[in-house]
Structures are given as structure tokens and as C-alpha cells.
């Protein structure tokens, strides 16, 4: 995976640079890149894009035809570049890096919150306020429920994980007793 990230990085940085200078703005570009990544991540599309019988022009037309949003010329050029360099299937990785660059630029981060139970809006707000103080960033929450946690929450912000779930506490206790 590290190799894919390394190959995708220059494309994500170039795309971010173009998006930052565009009047449509970073959020519009992030949505569009997310859609492109979703199309590129489809198994049928991946299979078609690796078909040796298709030329570059056919791949470009096929791929752009599957995208619902009208593509600006800069994005069409980007897709042509990816196809010419056999990098179109890296779009999901490029999109992830683009969002990371966008978040860093905006001073924000995605907070993946996993809870054992459904959290109310007030609970999410209170948790995010505490986490924003801890991480020093404006956080965008994404909440999922995983009953296997038994209780508590697990929060991932970037590469940092804060796990206060009962499941994690039991695992630590088990490891301590086994040692």
C-alpha cells in the first residue's frame, strides 16, 4: 500500500494545486474527486480499464461516460493523463490523499467515531468539542455503531487512535493477566 501511496502522491498534489486555484473551490473538487474514485473503485470498471483490447481514447470515453457530474476541462485533462500513464485505477488512493491535503489546508481532520451504542447529536457534539481541544484541529465526525465494542468509543483521527471501549480494556486486562 505504501508503494501505491507514493505513486499517487504527485497526482494528488497536482490535483490539489489546481483545485485550490479554481473558482469552484475545494469542497466542489473534493466531491467530484470522490465521485471519480467511486467509479474507479467499481470492480467492473477496474476490469474494463485493464482490458488490453481498449485503447486510451476508448478508456477515457468509457470512464467519463460513467461519471454523472459534468467534468470541467481540467478534470478531463487529469483523467487523460492518468489513462496515458496507466494510473486511472489509483484514483481511490489519489482521492484519499487529496482529501488529506484539503483537510490539512483547512486545518481540519476527519474523526472516525465508532461507538457501542447510538450517540445523540448532543453526545457527538460534546465528544467532538473535547477531541478538538485534544487534537488542536477542527474535526468532522463520522459516527458508526459496532456492538462488539460492548461499551465506550473508539476514535480515529488521521493515524492516531483513541480507544476507550470496553473491548479494548478487556483486551489490555487479558494481556496483563497472560504476562
UniProtKB/Swiss-Prot annotation:
Keywords assigned: ATP synthesis, Cell inner membrane, Cell membrane, CF(1), Hydrogen ion transport, Ion transport, Membrane, Transport
Superkingdom: Bacteria
Location in or out of the cell: Cell inner membrane
InterPro entries: ATP_synth_OSCP/delta_N_sf (IPR026015), ATPase_OSCP/dsu (IPR000711)
UniProt keyword Ribosomal protein present: no
Coiled-coil region list: none
Membrane topology summary: Peripheral membrane protein
GO cellular component: plasma membrane; proton-transporting ATP synthase complex
GO MF entries: proton-transporting ATP synthase activity, rotational mechanism
UniProt subunit comment: F-type ATPases have 2 components, F(1) - the catalytic core - and F(0) - the membrane proton channel. F(1) has five subunits: alpha(3), beta(3), gamma(1), delta(1), epsilon(1). F(0) has three main subunits: a(1), b(2) and c(10-14). The alpha and beta chains form an alternating ring which encloses part of the gamma chain. F(1) is attached to F(0) by a central stalk formed by the gamma and epsilon chains, while a peripheral stalk is formed by the delta and b chains.
HAMAP family: ATP_synth_delta_bact
Free-text function comment from the UniProt entry: F(1)F(0) ATP synthase produces ATP from ADP in the presence of a proton or sodium gradient. F-type ATPases consist of two structural domains, F(1) containing the extramembraneous catalytic core and F(0) containing the membrane proton channel, linked together by a central stalk and a peripheral stalk. During catalysis, ATP synthesis in the catalytic domain of F(1) is coupled via a rotary mechanism of the central stalk subunits to proton translocation.
Stored PANTHER family: ATP SYNTHASE DELTA CHAIN
Protein name as it appears in the record: ATP synthase subunit delta
Source species of the chain: Bordetella petrii (strain ATCC BAA-461 / DSM 12804 / CCUG 43448)
Gene: atpH
Amino acid at each position: 500500500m505504501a508503494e501505491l501511496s507514493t505513486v499517487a502522491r504527485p497526482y494528488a498534489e497536482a490535483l490539489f494545486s489546481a483545485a485550490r486555484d479554481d473558482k469552484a473551490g475545494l469542497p466542489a473538487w473534493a466531491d467530484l474527486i470522490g465521485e471519480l474514485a467511486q467509479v474507479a473503485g467499481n470492480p467492473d470498471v477496474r476490469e474494463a480499464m485493464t482490458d488490453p483490447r481498449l485503447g486510451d481514447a476508448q478508456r477515457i470515453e468509457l470512464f467519463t461516460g460513467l461519471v454523472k457530474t459534468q467534468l470541467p476541462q481540467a478534470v478531463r485533462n487529469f483523467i487523460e493523463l492518468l489513462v496515458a500513464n496507466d494510473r486511472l485505477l489509483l484514483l481511490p488512493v489519489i482521492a484519499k490523499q487529496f482529501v488529506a491535503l484539503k483537510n490539512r489546508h483547512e486545518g481540519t481532520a476527519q474523526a472516525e467515531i465508532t461507538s457501542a451504542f447510538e450517540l445523540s447529536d448532543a453526545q457527538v457534539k460534546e465528544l467532538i468539542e473535547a477531541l478538538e481541544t485534544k487534537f488542536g484541529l477542527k474535526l468532522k465526525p463520522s459516527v458508526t455503531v459496532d456492538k462488539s465494542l460492548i461499551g465506550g468509543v473508539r476514535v480515529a483521527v488521521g493515524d492516531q487512535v483513541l480507544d476507550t471501549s470496553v473491548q479494548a480494556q478487556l483486551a489490555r486486562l487479558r494481556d496483563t493477566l497472560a504476562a
